[in-house]
């Protein structure tokens, strides 16, 4: 099993759209953002599909909204990791915050891991809706494929008579509608291409930042002033706009202290030579 996947592995260059399509197709969901999977329930069910019977799905809360409930899901996931001897660390405190990049990175790893089992072939007998149900009633998973009540209500209405159908078909120029649909389809394709390119570029630079972070966490470099300054920028919150200024100020102060110490040591050596 490919549990140890390096940051430069091709798995971490899989775009957001591909990840969402993978989740939605396999679990019959309709997620539109990766952060919607921050509760950990999706990850639990992905492993339930990959390793039938290993995940206690009755303990997985698909309605988790607060951090406490989400953490309980991740505890279930951690237990499953332990059973399967998966060494991937779960950064629960970061995942439950719902930050897109943190969740995207974990889902990229999960997809790579699941694809490495049985060649990524899906279990055809697996019913995702039934597995995440409680007492025969589907849980209210955000983004699940349900029929809106308005459509259900409309289905109960008697069908229109043939004369009204004929009138509706005759109304409006078909050619104009066809041209409009074609134009919108082309615009949609162009937008998708642009989005995919932007996602690849974003993921590329994210992987670079991740490499810098790993380098900064090296014990031999951890206390160097330049490394501390870089960490101040890497770990700055979104609201902190002066991260660069703070890092520069810290670096200047640290280097200033070192220069003063070096100058003091030089003067002391010069004085000792004079006395000698």
UniProtKB/Swiss-Prot annotation:
Domain called EB1 C-terminal: residue spans: 173-243
Domain description: Composed of two functionally independent domains. The N-terminal domain forms a hydrophobic cleft involved in microtubule binding and the C-terminal is involved in protein binding. In Arabidopsis thaliana, EB1A and EB1B possess an acidic C-terminal tail that has autoinhibitory function, but EB1C has a tail region with patches of basic amino acid residues required for nuclear targeting.
Tissue note: Highly expressed in guard cells of leaf stomata, pollen grains and pollen tubes. Expressed in young roots.
Deletion consequences: No visible phenotype under normal growth conditions.
Localization terms from the record: Cytoplasm, Cytoskeleton, Spindle pole; Cytoplasm, Cytoskeleton, Phragmoplast
Keywords: Cell cycle, Cell division, Cytoplasm, Cytoskeleton, Host-virus interaction, Microtubule, Mitosis
Entry GO MF terms: microtubule binding
Entry keyword tRNA-binding: no
Its biological purpose: Binds to the plus end of microtubules and regulates the dynamics of the microtubule cytoskeleton. May be involved in anchoring microtubules to their nucleation sites and/or functioning as a reservoir for distribution to the growing end. In plants, microtubule minus ends are not necessarily severed from the nucleation site and transported to the plus end of a microtubule as part of the recycling process. May play a role in endomembrane organization during polarized growth of plant cells.
The name this protein goes by in its record: Microtubule-associated protein RP/EB family member 1A
Keyword Cell division: yes
Chain intervals with Acidic residues compositional bias: 257-270
Family membership noted in the UniProt record: Belongs to the MAPRE family.
A GO-annotated cellular component: microtubule organizing center
Region feature Disordered, mapped onto this chain: 124-172, 252-276
Residue ranges, compositional bias (Low complexity): 162-172
Record organism: Arabidopsis thaliana (Mouse-ear cress)
Pfam families: CH (PF00307), EB1 (PF03271)
Subunit structure: Homodimer and heterodimer with EB1B. Interacts with tobamovirus movement protein.
UniProt-listed PANTHER family: MICROTUBULE-ASSOCIATED PROTEIN RP/EB FAMILY MEMBER
InterPro entries per the UniProt record, alphabetical: CH_dom, CH_dom_sf, EB1_C, EB1_C_sf, MAPRE
């Amino acid at each position: 099993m490919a549990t140890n996947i390096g940051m430069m592995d091709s798995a971490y260059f899989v775009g957001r759209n591909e990840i969402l399509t993978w989740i939605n197709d396999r679990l019959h969901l309709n997620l539109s953002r990766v952060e919607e999977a921050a509760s950990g329930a999706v990850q639990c069910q992905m492993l339930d599909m990959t390793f039938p019977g290993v995940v206690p799905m009755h303990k997985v809360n698909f309605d988790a909204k607060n951090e406490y409930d989400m953490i309980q899901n991740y505890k279930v996931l951690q237990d499953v990791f332990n059973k399967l001897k998966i060494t991937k660390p779960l950064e629960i405190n970061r995942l439950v915050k719902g930050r897109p990049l943190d969740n995207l990175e974990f889902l990229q790893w999960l997809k790579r891991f699941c694809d490495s089992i049985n060649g990524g072939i899906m279990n055809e007998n697996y019913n995702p809706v039934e597995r995440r149900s409680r007492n025969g009633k589907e849980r209210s998973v955000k983004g699940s494929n349900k029929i809106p009540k308005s459509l259900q209500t409309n289905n109960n209405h008697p069908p229109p008579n043939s004369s009204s159908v004929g009138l509706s078909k005759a109304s409006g120029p078909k050619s104009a509608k066809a041209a409009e649909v074609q134009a919108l389809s082309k615009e949609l394709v162009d937008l998708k291409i642009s989005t995919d390119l932007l996602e690849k570029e974003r993921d590329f630079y994210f992987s670079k930042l991740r490499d810098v972070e790993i380098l900064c966490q090296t014990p031999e470099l951890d206390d160097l002033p330049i490394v501390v300054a870089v960490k101040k920028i890497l770990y700055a919150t979104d609201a902190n706009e002066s991260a660069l200024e703070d890092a520069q100020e810290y670096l200047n102060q640290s280097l200033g202290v070192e220069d003063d110490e070096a100058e003091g040591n030089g003067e002391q050596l010069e004085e000792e030579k004079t006395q000698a």
